[in-house]
């Protein structure tokens, strides 16, 4: 077996007085006939300092050396390489990082510390010979995910393996063995011992599992594994609560949870997190009223709680929450053109992602991949607006804020500009400087009248405080 290995790393293997092995994904993917990974894991019965010195001699610079775990990080030809000494790991029980390690010169012991047999096949970089202490080659041939030791033991050591199982099985198209599923299910609660940041990172990788080896709908398969192993109950209990909640059969073929999964299945990669969470408010709405009405409003708050708990980036959180709040707009397709025009301008910053979500939501109802009728209607309206030259952003407006001086009070400038944008949304031909200046004067006058009719509530209180 010959792997795609950087030249200087291969030379290092030939010069070393110990066998140097590739292990993990690089070997697994080569045996499975999958595209080569850029990252390479290597190992040997040698300590980190000895390997680091040899690497430096070969012209490969080590970026980090961790003597306690026998780990050396390198980069060569733009590829990341991680070396580890043969070792066995000891865990407190469920946490991702081992609490102690013991170095060994036995490849069998090193293989047993790994998670799945498909990741415990070794290739000697000098001879090209494959070493398979645990029968991982057969599992790769049969596209099976099996643990290196009893599944209960493997998952009880490191809770992150619960999510790695779902993600890697989905990426590879492998089927977890029954023992593996049962072991994961028995230890599902151990995911609570893993940091929110790691869970979120693994969830994102799973939601993009189809991209690793171009396996269509792989991410959907990963979500189903999270459901079957009940890991979903711990990382996203609000979503899992949708299991078994029936929906109107004239609109839906699936319960709330399965619909969320299928919406995510058909969603563009850029909005999959929003697709997964878009109906997360339905269980709460049903609990309150016995109906799903208002689940979009409830869902916005619940999605925010989830993403803050997972420590998702603020930008991602805001996008997902906005899309969740807006996804029900014009569901029945009865919104008037004037309303759609205003909506498209008000929500221009999330309009394209919202279209993607509405399409995925439509497809997820009855697995219908045709164009969502509401989107066809919206597209006709926005195409018309573009032909008219309607501005969708303040930058496209024919007047700037400084041009409203003397017409509009300075504190009201931002409000007036937004109103001008909506004014033009109804007829793009209005986007002319003179027309907008006249309209700005009218708007300013209306604001003054409103303020005169409804004085600020805080004014009497301020006067009392002055006395």
Residue spans for each PLM region:
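Catalytic cores of the polymerase beta-like nucleotidyltransferase superfamily
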Residues: 1-467
């Amino acid at each position: 077996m010959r792997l795609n290995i950087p030249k200087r790393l291969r030379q290092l293997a030939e010069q070393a007085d110990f066998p140097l092995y590739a292990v993990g994904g690089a070997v697994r993917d080569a045996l499975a006939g999958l595209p080569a990974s850029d990252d390479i894991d290597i190992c040997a019965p040698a300590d980190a300092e000895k390997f680091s010195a040899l690497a430096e001699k070969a012209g490969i610079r080590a970026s980090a050396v961790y003597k306690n775990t026998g780990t050396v990080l390198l980069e060569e030809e733009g590829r990341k390489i991680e070396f580890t000494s043969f070792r066995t790991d000891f865990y407190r029980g469920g946490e991702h990082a081992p609490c102690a390690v013991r170095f060994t010169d036995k490849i069998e012991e090193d293989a047993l510390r790994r998670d799945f047999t498909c990741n415990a096949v070794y290739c000697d970089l000098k001879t090209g010979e494959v070493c398979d202490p645990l029968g991982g080659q057969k599992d790769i041939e049969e596209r099976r995910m099996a643990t290196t030791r009893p599944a209960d033991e493997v998952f009880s050591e490191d809770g992150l393996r619960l999510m790695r199982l779902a993600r890697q099985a989905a990426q590879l198209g492998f089927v977890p063995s029954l023992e593996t599923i049962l072991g994961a299910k028995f230890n599902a609660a151990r995911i609570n011992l893993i940091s929110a940041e790691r869970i979120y990172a693994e969830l994102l990788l799973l939601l993009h599992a189809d991209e690793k080896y171009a396996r269509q709908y792989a991410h959907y398969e990963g979500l189903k594994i999270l459901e079957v192993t009940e890991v979903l109950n711990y990382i996203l209990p609000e979503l899992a609560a949708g299991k078994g909640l029936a929906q109107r059969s004239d609109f839906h073929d699936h319960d709330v949870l399965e619909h969320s999964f299928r919406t995510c299945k058909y969603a563009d990669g850029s909005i999959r997190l929003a697709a997964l969470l878009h109906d997360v408010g339905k269980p709460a709405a049903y609990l309150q009223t016995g109906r799903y009405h208002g689940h979009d409003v409830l869902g916005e708050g619940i999605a925010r709680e989830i993403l803050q708990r997972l420590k998702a980036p603020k930008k991602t959180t805001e996008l997902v929450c906005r899309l969740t709040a807006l996804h029900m707009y014009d569901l029945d397709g009865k919104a008037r053109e004037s309303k759609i025009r205003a909506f498209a301008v008000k929500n221009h910053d999330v309009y394209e992602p919202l279209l993607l979500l509405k399409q995925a939501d439509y497809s997820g109802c009855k697995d219908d991949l045709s164009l969502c009728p509401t989107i066809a209607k919206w597209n006709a309206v926005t195409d018309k607006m573009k032909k008219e030259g309607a501005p969708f952003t303040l930058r496209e407006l024919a007047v700037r804020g400084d041009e409203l001086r003397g017409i509009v009070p300075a504190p009201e400038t931002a409000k007036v500009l937004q109103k001008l944008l909506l004014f033009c949304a109804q007829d793009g031909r209005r986007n002319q400087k003179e027309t907008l200046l006249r309209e700005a004067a009218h708007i300013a006058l209306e604001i003054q009248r409103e303020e005169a009719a409804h004085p600020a509530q805080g004014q009497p209180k301020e006067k009392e405080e002055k006395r």
